[in-house]
């Protein structure tokens, strides 16, 4: 989980060190660390924005490296030639970052009062021609993406002002380093004051800006997603104790319970809020599409998992997403559509991080026996509906029950259907479900929450309880629950008492939510 922060820290550190080299070439006798840390701070702040692309920070580093190398060229003719070569290369690598480089080149020549400085305007003109030409040729869709850092933000959203701050800091830092007194023989006291003032200013800016831009609300979601990605189900469950007010968190939690086979037994031990917590509403975003694809895959609804994986792949900013490609590989292997799976595998094989995974899954191509023997793909293929139909057209519960009847050994479809009814408080539908399937291979015994719901269906009919083999522990617990309610009927603290003593039961959920 720390690889990402380490990579970002390494990039930002490299930016700070390269900025220092640039500033020292202009003012070699001063440690003006305020100038070379400001871009680092602003780039750090924009990293917190979910819609920002880290490519923008990498491009900024390439710009600084190029500028630092260019400034070390002494001969103005070679310097001009190098700038004219670097600008199109930077545009090819990082788009509008080439404009920041060309502007810095012209500015550096201007503040250096170079006799040939006028000729360096050709670098800026070259960049303008490249940018305009890229839009005219439709290589880039908008002038905004050719000339502004908006290219490194979600294309359909307006970029925040913060994204421009680091870009503005670079030319201002060049000017600041030039105009600041050189002071070769400056006293230690004055130097100490300068460093202290800069240090205080940096600390103040960090104190003001980091809490403002650091999106702590999104952090728990990122944690849950990491544990889901690495299949650490117990960690997800551990992080979801206490109040939960977000359907996305609940979807992660309920998926973890389902993966462990504990959904119908333990779901009411957590802060449930209706059936939306089983499957969050789809909002056409990459995050929710990916989450739903994973949840449907756990559930065995392969068609819906494939649909959500594709939606996630096409809605993510950038050039697709390997996580969704992995799911598309799996779903197509399960369906036996091997040519499509092979196409996606070929894409993943070209990546560094997913090459081994893709190579391993290539072994499943056109190999039904290998798929059926695989612990992940095999059960999913076995649970596919025998008759072709449109998934979800008659409701998810209808599809789940077809699969439950077809593969009774897999208890998740029937338990998930019951969970939908209980969370919706649709007791009539739940009653029809258990009366039809209880005692059959589809539902040989009732999970704990189902037993608790049976008592609510017929609170005074003990024979009805016996029909569904409600356990003695559940009956004794209900007796305590009923006594608590009767004894505190007029007590305004009754909800708190129920929550404290019976908060992990369906009776508490049914009464209080």
Model regions and ranges:
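Short hydrophobic alpha-helices at membrane interfaces in multi-pass membrane enzymes
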Residues: 31-37, 60, 71-87, 115-124
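Cytosolic-side transmembrane helix boundary signature
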Residues: 157-198
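Perimembrane helix-loop-helix junctions
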Residues: 100-121
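Terminal, low-structured helical/coil segments at or just beyond the last alpha-helical repeat
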Residues: 402-407, 411, 420, 462-513
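Soluble catalytic regions of membrane-associated enzymes that act on cell-envelope
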Residues: 210-381, 405-424
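Alpha-helical transmembrane segments
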Residues: 20, 67-69, 108-109, 131-135, ...
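Membrane-interface micro-motifs in multi-pass membrane enzymes
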Residues: 2-20, 24-74, 93, 97, ...
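Internal/C-terminal transmembrane anchor helices
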Residues: 188-215
């Amino acid at each position: 989980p720390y690889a990402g922060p380490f990579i970002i820290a390494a990039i930002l550190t490299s930016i700070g060190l390269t900025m220092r080299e640039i500033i020292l070439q202009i003012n070699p006798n001063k440690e003006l660390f305020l100038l070379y840390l400001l871009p680092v701070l602003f780039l750090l702040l924009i990293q917190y924005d979910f819609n920002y692309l880290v490519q923008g920070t990498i491009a900024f580093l390439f710009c600084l490296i190029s500028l630092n190398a260019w400034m070390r060229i002494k001969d103005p003719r070679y310097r001009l030639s190098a700038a004219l070569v670097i600008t199109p290369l930077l545009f090819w690598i990082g788009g509008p970052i080439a404009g920041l480089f060309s502007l810095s080149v012209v500015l550096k020549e201007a503040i250096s009062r170079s006799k040939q400085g006028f000729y360096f305007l050709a670098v800026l003109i070259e960049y303008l021609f490249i940018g305009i030409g890229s839009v005219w040729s439709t290589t880039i869709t908008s002038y905004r993406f050719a000339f502004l850092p908006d290219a490194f933000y979600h294309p359909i959203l307006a970029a925040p002002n913060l994204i421009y701050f680091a870009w503005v800091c670079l030319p201002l830092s060049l000017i600041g380093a030039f105009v600041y007194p050189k002071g070769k023989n400056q006293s230690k006291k004055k130097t100490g004051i300068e460093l202290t003032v800069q240090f205080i200013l940096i600390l103040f800016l960090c104190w003001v800006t980091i809490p403002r831009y650091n999106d702590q609300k999104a952090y728990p979601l990122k944690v849950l997603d990491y544990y889901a990605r690495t299949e650490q189900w117990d960690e997800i469950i551990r992080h979801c104790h206490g109040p939960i007010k977000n359907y996305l968190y609940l979807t992660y939690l309920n998926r973890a319970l389902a993966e462990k086979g504990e959904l119908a037994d333990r779901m009411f031990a957590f802060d449930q809020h209706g059936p939306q917590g089983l499957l969050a509403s789809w909002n056409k975003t990459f995050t929710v599409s990916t989450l739903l694809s994973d949840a449907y895959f756990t559930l065995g609804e392969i068609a819906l998992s494939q649909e959500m994986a594709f939606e996630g792949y096409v809605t993510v900013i950038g050039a697709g997403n390997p996580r969704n490609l992995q799911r598309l590989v799996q779903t197509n292997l399960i369906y036996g559509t091997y040519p499509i799976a092979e196409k996606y595998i070929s894409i993943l094989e070209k990546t560094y991080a997913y090459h081994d995974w893709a190579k391993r899954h290539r072994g499943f191509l056109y190999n039904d026996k290998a798929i059926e023997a695989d612990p992940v793909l095999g059960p999913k293929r076995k649970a596919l509906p025998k008759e072709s139909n449109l998934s979800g057209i008659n409701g998810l519960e209808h599809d789940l029950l077809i699969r439950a009847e077809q593969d009774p050994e897999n208890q998740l479809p029937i338990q998930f259907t019951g969970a939908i009814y209980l969370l919706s408080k649709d007791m009539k539908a739940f009653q029809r479900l258990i009366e039809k399937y209880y005692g059959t291979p589809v539902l040989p015994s009732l999970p704990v929450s189902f037993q608790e719901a049976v008592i609510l269906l017929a609170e005074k009919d003990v024979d009805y309880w016996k029909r569904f083999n409600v356990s003695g522990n559940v009956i004794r617990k209900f007796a305590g629950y009923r006594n608590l309610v009767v004894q505190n009927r007029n007590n305004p603290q009754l909800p708190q008492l129920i929550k404290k003593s019976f908060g992990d039961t369906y009776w508490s959920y049914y009464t209080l939510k």
